[in-house]
Design a protein with these regions (language model features):
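Short, compositionally biased serine/threonine- and acidic-rich segments at solvent-exposed termini, linkers
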Residues: 137-168
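Beta-strand-rich interaction surfaces with strong enrichment in secreted/lumenal proteins
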Residues: 94-97, 105-112, 125
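Surface-exposed coil/turn segments at beta-strand junctions on protein surfaces, enriched
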Residues: 46, 65, 101, 112-114, ...
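Surface-exposed loop/turn motifs at beta-strand-loop junctions within extracellular Ig-like
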Residues: 59, 78, 125, 140-144
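Caspase-like cysteine protease fold
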Residues: 1-62, 148-160
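Short glycine/proline/serine/threonine-rich loop/turn segments at secondary-structure transition edges
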Residues: 125-135
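Short flexible loop/turn segments that cap and initiate beta-strands
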Residues: 58-93
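Exposed aromatic-hydrophobic patches
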Residues: 118-124
Length: 168
């Protein structure tokens, strides 16, 4: 058709690449994760377990920001899956393999009061049962400040034998 594959890769940057990105200075950390079915602290999320997550907004020096009151947006992701590009140009290039963490197990908003937050959720049954680690992703803000954080050391695997039976 006369269209070269190299012309498809041209693009224009909008904005000033010399500007520094406004990355929040405050950090968000998880302090405790509990399985409410067993009332135990856990390091693994099982399907159908009811989980309570507690955390804090910390200053640059690691202290709880008692003056921070705002909203926390949180997402919990299942393990990454392996994907491959399609090589639609049919060139001599090999398809590219990459990992993508796209399956969201929980997304919600909760209030942060005096730098502390907590929320509960039920881990869905349709998790990936392959061994691996999931991810918590956090963003909190108020009128004056914002904070970011992530926790990637949470194992998501198995089924909670203590989960309540759903008879509906």
């Amino acid at each position: 058709t006369g269209i070269s594959a190299t012309n498809k890769l041209k693009f224009t940057l909008l904005g000033d690449p010399a500007l520094k990105l406004p990355i929040p200075q405050l950090n968000i950390v998880i302090t405790d994760i509990f399985n409410l079915n067993t009332n135990e602290q856990i390091d693994t999320l099982n399907a159908l377990s009811t989980v309570k997550v507690k955390g804090a907004v910390l200053s640059e020096h690691g202290y709880v920001m008692n003056s921070f009151n705002g909203l926390l947006k949180s997402k919990v992701y299942d393990k990454p899956i392996k994907l491959q590009t399609l090589n639609n140009d049919f060139e001599d290039l090999e398809p590219f393999n990459f990992d993508l963490q796209q399956s969201i197990l929980y997304a919600g908003n909760v209030s942060v009061e005096e730098g502390l937050f907590e929320f509960e959720f039920v881990v869905p049954q349709d998790i990936s049962y392959v061994d691996g680690s999931g991810k918590f992703s956090f963003y909190a803000y108020n009128d004056e400040q914002d904070a970011i954080g992530a926790h990637v050391d949470i194992i998501i695997s198995g089924f909670d034998e203590d989960a309540e039976v759903d008879n509906i």
